[in-house]
């Protein structure tokens, strides 16, 4: 606060998030959900994720994974020009960074099944047994071993779809009174946006 007429403030907020989720292709039938009860112990079988598992180093993994962080910073100026008029201005920036995982595979196994489809944990409402551990988790270590043993490159791979955006803006609002019954509001709103989306 410079004086009674001018106030300046700076704000910033943001919360990184990540989550694993089930693919649209990983839905189970009622019979399929009941079949995974033994994997969930005393928890609801409907929390089961057919592609949840652990990587070669014990890290948690899912064929469908998302991470994103979009903090916003704002510099605000409030000017009380006189008893009737004021000007409120905010300059802000928002930088978004994140990605989503997706399983890839372009070859077929001996049975003619494409490796890309093996990333889906279920088929027609039933749980798949491809790369399935005895505890119901998806066996990412087995996929890694298969890729290492291949003479023709990786049979199955995880790709990242990267989403980046930059927002820059200026918002200013002028307010004044004309007499006792008329309020006037006017302002400007400038915005620059650039987004980059890559795989």
Regions found by a protein language model. Give the residues of each.
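Transmembrane beta-strands of outer-membrane beta-barrel pores
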Residues: 14-18, 93-97, 190-196
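Outer-membrane beta-barrel transmembrane strands
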Residues: 57-102, 154-183, 196-197
